[in-house]
């Protein structure tokens, strides 16, 4: 395919136009008085959102050079979302500001490589200073504040704080759509996995269609059980003790299933069978997790164990097990606490070592089931459009809260960026172009406050000067149009979000400035086939 080429200033300006189109679309959403953007969808109703990365992902421009610029800034938003889960609008805004100021200097004859050196130097210093002013998150109140600022809702803030308090730092919190109008929180205590009973005849409560087993033995195996003779010895031992049994296996079928159901219906013996969770190697690991949690052993051919040789001490135990059509929950497994801690540490190491986001997510779920718990925030709304918008806001707030717990919080509303400007201004260099790069970051750090003020109908430049004149930590409360101590008022941003937004914006923008040529495909023209003879309108009456 043939290519079109642009060089120097023309290439940079064409790409900058794309950067501006994307960033100008996203920037209107920043701050407590930011607006929403409507995204057209091929199927279903349009999506209304103020989530920067969601908006950025939808933007594809017709001009190939403009599109290149837009895609580069889209990467800033995506990377920030991957690392911190929030701050994508701020990152986009910073990238635009660095590119705009940088191109002015490059056009005036400055060396882009030296400018990039200055930008990197300034960002390193900025990140250092952000960490210095960072404060750790203390308790439920701080968590609620972070979530409330991100979601622009105090109710959501309280909900997320409740969820984090109940499942702990190792817990997993998921956001799902609710069938009702309200938004509520459901916390699953104990270990839950998505497998239900193999036969409805095994239920103990026919009204709720669930089986609840108290003080229960748990047989864990990766084998398929079809012959009752295989498990008869262990069944006889359990019957003698008058206990109940949960069997977790690859499957229960044939004679084994019918015998267990028959004994349950006769009232001789209560046993519930469920299929093992997961697939392949992940299944083996999950069965081992259950075994450690309950103090049992996995009966597996790989380990040279046979079902006929199972004894009572190989079984797991738990205070209670609840089995529904779709889920099994094990509460208060009687496993050895030291063994559980060792398993948790092992999973943490695997989380740090893995590069796959999917694997990391699955490992985090396993960790939560062993060490914390699982909370589900069910989001409800009157219409599907409102539901999607609400869900995106809660997901952002949840990510921001987790980031805050990890690295702490700084004054919000762009105040942290303003507070570190004097430290950036102190940086010097003998090379003029490096000094220009430092100045570019110094100016760019004003941009978030300017945009928050503009979106609130105030004059950005005036607000910036007033914030600079106040003591550190005091910023502009755009919602109430006044200057307040941001930390005391609860207007805070996660340190991780503030830091990664600047780092990612500077990384892409400084590389953008070094562009000297751009190459794009020339779209091929579609050759319309000639009209066949007689297909015209001539001769018709």
Swiss-Prot record:
It is an enzyme of class 5 (isomerase). The keyword Chaperone applies. The keyword RNA-binding does not apply. Keywords: ATP-binding, Chaperone, Cytoplasm, Isomerase, Nucleotide-binding. One of its GO terms (molecular function) is ATP binding. It is found in: Cytoplasm. Together with its co-chaperonin GroES, plays an essential role in assisting protein folding. The GroEL-GroES system forms a nano-cage that allows encapsulation of the non-native substrate proteins and provides a physical environment optimized to promote and accelerate protein folding. HAMAP family: CH60. PANTHER family: 60 KDA HEAT SHOCK PROTEIN, MITOCHONDRIAL. NCBIfam families: GroEL (TIGR02348), PRK00013.1 (NF000592), PRK12849.1 (NF009487), PRK12850.1 (NF009488), PRK12851.1 (NF009489). Belongs to the chaperonin (HSP60) family. This is Chaperonin GroEL. It comes from Clostridium botulinum (strain Hall / ATCC 3502 / NCTC 13319 / Type A).
């Amino acid at each position: 395919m043939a290519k079109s080429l642009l060089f120097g200033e023309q290439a940079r300006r064409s790409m900058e136009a794309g950067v501006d189109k994307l960033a100008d679309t996203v920037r209107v959403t920043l701050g407590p008085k930011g607006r929403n953007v409507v995204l057209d969808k091929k199927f279903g109703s349009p999506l209304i959102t103020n989530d920067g990365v969601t908006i950025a992902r939808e933007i594809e421009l017709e001009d190939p050079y403009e599109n290149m610029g837009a895609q580069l800034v889209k990467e800033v938003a995506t990377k920030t979302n991957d690392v911190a889960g929030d701050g994508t609008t701020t990152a986009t805004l910073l990238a635009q500001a660095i590119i705009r100021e940088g191109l002015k200097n490059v056009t005036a004859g400055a060396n882009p490589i030296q400018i990039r050196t200055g930008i990197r130097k300034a960002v390193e210093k900025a990140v250092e200073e952000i960490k210095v002013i960072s404060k750790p998150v203390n308790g439920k109140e701080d968590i609620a504040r972070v979530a409330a600022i991100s979601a622009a809702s105090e109710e959501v803030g309280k909900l997320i704080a409740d969820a984090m308090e109940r499942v702990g730092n190792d817990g997993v919190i998921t956001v799902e759509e609710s069938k009702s109008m309200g938004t509520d929180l459901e916390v699953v205590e104990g270990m839950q996995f998505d497998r239900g009973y193999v036969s409805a005849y095994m239920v103990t409560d026919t009204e709720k269609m669930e089986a609840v087993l108290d003080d229960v033995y748990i047989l864990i195996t990766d084998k398929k059980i079809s012959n009752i003779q295989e498990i008869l010895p262990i069944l006889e031992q359990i019957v003698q003790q008058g206990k109940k049994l949960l069997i977790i296996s690859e499957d229960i079928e044939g004679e084994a299933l019918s015998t267990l159901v028959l004994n349950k219906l006769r009232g001789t013996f209560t046993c519930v069978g469920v299929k093992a969770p997961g697939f392949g190697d992940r299944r083996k690991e999950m069965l081992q997790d259950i075994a450690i949690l309950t103090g049992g052993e996995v009966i597996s051919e790989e380990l040279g164990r046979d079902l006929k040789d199972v004894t009572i001490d190989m079984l797991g135990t738990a205070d209670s097990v609840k089995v529904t059509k779709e889920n099994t929950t094990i509460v208060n497994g009687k496993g050895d606490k030291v063994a559980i801690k060792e398993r948790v540490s092992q999973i943490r190491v695997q989380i740090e070592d893995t590069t796959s986001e999917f694997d990391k997510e699955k490992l985090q779920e396993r960790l939560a089931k062993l060490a914390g718990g699982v909370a589900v925030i069910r989001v409800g709304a009157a219409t599907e459009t409102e539901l999607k918008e609400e869900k995106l806001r809660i997901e952002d707030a949840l990510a921001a809260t987790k980031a805050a717990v990890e690295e702490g919080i700084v004054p919000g509303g762009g105040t942290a960026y303003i507070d570190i400007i004097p430290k950036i201004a102190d940086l010097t260099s003998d090379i003029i172009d490096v000094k220009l790069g430092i100045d570019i970051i110094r100016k760019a750090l004003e941009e978030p406050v300017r945009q928050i003020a503009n979106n609130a109908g105030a004059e950005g430049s005036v607000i910036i000067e007033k914030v600079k004149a106040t003591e550190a930590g005091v910023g502009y409360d755009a919602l109430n149009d006044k200057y307040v101590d941001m930390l005391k008022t609860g207007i805070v941003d996660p340190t991780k979000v503030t830091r990664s937004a600047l780092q990612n914006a500077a990384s892409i923008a400084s590389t953008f400035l070094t562009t000297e040529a751009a190459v794009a495909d020339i779209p091929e023209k579609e050759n319309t086939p000639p009209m066949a003879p007689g297909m015209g309108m001539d001769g018709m009456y």
